[in-house]
UniProtKB/Swiss-Prot annotation:
HAMAP family: IF_2_B. Residues 47-196 are annotated as: Disordered. This is Translation initiation factor IF-2. Its main location: cytoplasm. GO terms for cellular component: cytosol. Residues 53-65 have a biased composition (Basic and acidic residues). Belongs to the TRAFAC class translation factor GTPase superfamily. Classic translation factor GTPase family. IF-2 subfamily. The gene is infB.
Length: 782
């Protein structure tokens, strides 16, 4: 049994709190006030004490009730003699026997304190009759009228009814009801028992918590106030406050962790954590990423494997965006991802490493380990993937595979021939040497890894590439990591959504469904997703739409808050950024991966005093809206493998917007870097242009000291800075106030001529002082 407060006990037993406190003190139990609690033992003693008091109080009430019932029977028989009244009331005078109603009032109604309604009616009825004998007149202005109080209403019946009251119909009915209602209060409902445990998620309002605890919100607000927490009925309570209240009531608390269905990562985590039926798992093709330094032969290797000329389609022989291809060798499939190799595409390569199973590290035998080779090793190790080293270009005369092996041992890649666990495969991608051995090694590693997937579930996977096609709209290249993707599936891709309208495989053929570890190009999305986003197929289009719209709105809010939010941690950074100049840049490219790579490269440019600010990135041609944004923000537009429309070109000419078009990323980076150097605060170099010797000084009121000078070297100009040198020491540095030759102002005075000079804010010029004139010349930064 839980503890009860004094006021709660008093309310339940319909007694005053003061009476309960006195009863407790009589029992030897000290309490402070009505808010004090009563334990279980004290409650038993108090119940016995209160019950005993109530029984004693009920005894006289029963006697009174019996007397009252006996008196009420008298007036029901008006023709009877007064013998009954005398027997019931032997002390009553005989002169009052003809007034049974008055007799009832004076004797029967007096002890009946629990029936105020009858007393009221009897008082009013007797007040309508004239007083008899020595009784005082009732204090009623209309009591001398036998009819009733109101002259406009007919008088009531003066004959007593069976209950002993006068039959005054329609009078004081409402008052009687009110008196009965106010005198007999309703019994308060007994509070429900407290639950053993409540479950909540995140937070609860005071009203919600009160509902769970079967208590009034006001009671919880009082408890919170006593605990030092000021809260209103609709205020949310944190976990600590909820636990504090429930602990006071002795109720257990359990926090329910809600799963955010809009978080796509949850579906991938559930796949890892849930127990999967082994009978549904089938072997899936390995996903292989080819990594390495630029121009080490990655695309040529993949080209040789596919027997196509992919390299010829790339600008400058450099892979500009990710390609995904699937090969079939020995009745088994292998999925290849071709990631660009140079440093500008580090982010793309890191993204590719997170969705693959095996990494092929291509190293040129004639070049050795390069910076991008080291980055590729770090990405593969961070992803926990096995690495197969393909030593390429062994056909060249200067090739030295042993040197490559030796250099890679520094990065914990020890060949199997040297007692390590890393597979090394010497190849020549150009002539096709050693490719079959490399493929066998890939299949061997995939068998050891036991790569399996469940094709019977809804598909999940990642975005390899995305672009905006002029005829088809948003197009995304997806890699299905688990499940089967079908045409018509409702899908959420990153912050976009849609229904799979068409699917095209790497050979350009339309397909109706694709299984795990298969790359496919889809259409039907409402917007272009980001490369590296995850996708999940849902059961219906309504769910996919709701989740996609929620994710898009959250991303927009996060983007806005990220640009405006300032905390104490980054306050100093914002202050420093306020002192820096910015180059506003808009990037448009043919594919999303190129946009990200170019943006990442521009942000890494470190030029003192200038900061790059990328205000907009998108996929597709340069349009008029881009020109409008660039004109409003004074930005430069960089187009990578895209061209401006005719309307955009005309608008750019009218608005004087600078558009730079490139096909190779290095040229775009170098051009922006050069522009940034041009925007730096210019460097100045001091150049001495002349000297003059003070031959005479003249003091003029309201003008100051005029120095009569002779130019000994160079020239003195009106806008030059000057130094006053006395005995080889600079005593003042400032600007010329006036320069005159005779009485005329002069712009400059050459060597061998005399002039008059006044210096701003300096009059302490002495004879034989030297005035040195100089200018600050701007020099180009290197």
């Amino acid at each position: 049994m839980s503890k009860v407060r004094v006021y709660e006990y008093a309310k339940e037993h319909q007694v005053s709190s003061k009476k309960v406190i006195e009863a407790l003190k009589d029992l030897g139990i000290e309490v402070a006030n009505h808010m004090s609690t009563i334990n279980e033992n004290a409650l038993r003693q108090l119940d016995n004490a209160i019950d005993g008091t109530n029984k004693k109080a009920e005894a006289p009430k029963k006697e009174t009730t019996s007397n009252e019932n006996g008196n009420s029977k008298g007036p029901n028989k008006p023709n009877m003699t007064n013998s009954n009244e005398k027997s019931n009331k032997p002390n009553k005078p005989a002169g009052q026997a003809n007034k049974p109603a008055t007799a009832n009032k004076s004797h029967g109604a007096k002890p009946a304190t629990n029936k105020p309604a009858n007393t009221s009616n009897q008082t009013q009825s007797s007040g309508n009759k004239q007083p008899a004998g020595g009784q005082k007149r009732n204090n009623n202005n209309n009591s001398n009228r036998p009819g009733g109080g109101n002259p406009n209403r007919p008088g009531g019946n003066n004959r007593p009814n069976r209950g002993g009251n006068f039959n005054n119909k329609g009078r004081n009915t409402k008052k009687k009801g009110k008196l009965n209602h106010s005198t007999v209060p309703p019994t308060p409902p007994k509070p429900k028992e407290l639950p053993e445990k409540i479950v909540f998620s995140e937070s609860l309002t005071v009203a919600e918590l009160a509902k769970k605890l079967y208590r009034e919100p006001s009671e919880l607000i009082k408890k919170l106030f006593m605990l030092g927490v000021v809260a209103t009925i609709n205020q949310s309570l944190d976990k600590d406050a909820i636990e504090l209240i429930c602990d006071d009531y002795g109720v257990q608390v359990e926090e329910e962790i809600k799963v955010d269905v809009t978080d796509l990562d949850v579906y991938f985590e559930n796949e890892l954590n849930e127990a999967v039926d082994e009978s549904k798992l089938v072997e899936r093709p390995p996903v292989v990423t080819i990594m390495g330094h630029v121009d080490h032969g990655k695309t040529t290797l993949l080209d040789s494997l596919r027997n196509t000329k992919v390299t010829l389609g790339e600008a400058g022989g450099i892979t500009q965006h990710i390609g995904a291809y699937q090969l079939e060798i020995h009745d088994k499939k292998i999925t290849f991802l071709d990631t660009p190799g140079h440093a500008a595409f580090t982010a793309m390569r890191a993204r590719g490493a997170q969705i693959t199973d095996i990494t092929i590290l291509v190293v040129a035998a004639d070049d050795g380990v390069m910076p991008q080779t080291i980055e590729a090793i770090n990405h593969a190790k961070a992803a926990g993937m096995p690495i197969i080293v393909a030593v390429n270009k062994i056909d060249k005369p200067q090739a030295n595979p042993d040197r490559v092996m030796q250099e890679l041992t520094e990065y914990e890649l020890v060949p199997e021939a040297w007692g390590g666990d890393t597979i090394f495969a010497p190849i020549s991608a150009k002539f096709g040497e050693g490719l079959e051995n490399l493929l066998d090694m890939i299949l061997l590693v995939s068998e050891v890894e036991e790569l399996k997937a469940n094709p019977d579930r809804r598909a999940i996977g990642s975005v390899i590439e995305a672009e905006l096609d002029k005829g088809r709209g948003p197009v995304a290249t997806l890699l299905v990591q688990d499940g089967t993707l079908n045409i018509g599936d409702p899908i959420v891709v990153g912050n976009t959504f849609g229904r799979v309208r068409a699917m095209v495989n790497d050979l350009g053929r339309r397909v109706k469904k694709v299984g795990p570890s298969t790359p496919v190009e889809i259409t039907g999305l409402n917007d272009v997703p980001q490369a590296g986003d995850r996708f999940v197929v849902f059961e219906d289009e309504k769910t996919a739409r709701n989740i996609g719209e929620t994710r898009a709105s959250r991303a927009l809010v996060a983007q806005r808050s990220a640009t405006n939010r300032v905390s104490l941690d980054n306050l100093f950074e914002h202050m420093k950024a306020g002192e820096m100049k910015e180059v506003n840049v808009i990037i448009k490219a043919d594919v999303q991966g190129s946009v990200e790579a170019l943006a990442a490269s521009l942000r890494k440019i470190d030029v003192e005093g200038v900061n790059v600010k990328i205000i907009h990135t998108a996929v597709g041609a340069i349009n008029e809206s881009d020109i409008t944004l660039a004109a409003a923000s004074n930005a430069i537009i960089i187009g990578f493998n895209v061209r401006p429309t005719t309307q955009a070109r005309e608008a750019a000419e009218n608005e004087s917007v600078d558009i730079r078009l490139h096909r190779v990323i290095y040229k775009a980076i170098d051009e922006i870097e050069a522009a940034m150097k041009g925007m730096l605060d210019p460097e100045f170099q001091e150049k001495i242009i002349g000297q003059a010797q003070v031959r005479q000084t003249i003091n003029v009121s309201k003008v100051g000291t005029i120095a009569g000078c002779y130019v000994t070297d160079g020239k003195i100009t009106r806008d030059s800075g000057v130094r006053i040198i006395r005995d080889g020491i600079v005593v003042f540095e400032g600007e010329i106030a006036t320069l005159k030759r005779f009485k005329d102002d002069a712009k400059e005075v050459a060597k061998g001529y005399e002039c008059g000079i006044t210096v701003q804010n300096f009059n302490d010029i002495k004879e034989d002082d030297v005035i040195e004139a100089y200018v600050m010349e701007e020099i180009e930064r290197k």
